[in-house]
């Protein structure tokens, strides 16, 4: 574990792991007061199942850069499958479940929203696409942006690259990253 920054408003951490013959990977997280950007990489010779056992209310955008994953959540029927260069948005009152990484190489970024922060964002604006989501959020019902993950919008590539490759330092770095995270909403 490498704590890069731990401030009052911003945090940044890096983790890496390696087990001979089983696989290796890394996790890079950047947290703000209301959002967390995570970049996850794993390399394994075989498919791997990850369990998320903590039932937490969460909203998350997932961006798959490489590989395939199939997810099943404890309070939803069926599975959701994400592939290379796909994206989706998901809100759930119980984010616990299992995620099966189907390929030996997996690279993804997620943007996780704090529920109270998300509620404030939703109150600030109202558009047709957000209205359906707002109803689910108000009633605490799971919401999947669309039944199937979609191809990334061209602009998303640039925004995610700007976050991942940000060369600013100190407070400027975190203000820049936070503004880019807001662009992804």
Predicted regions and their residues:
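N-terminal functional module of multi-domain proteins
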Residues: 2-107
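Alpha-helical bundle regulatory/interaction domains
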Residues: 72-185
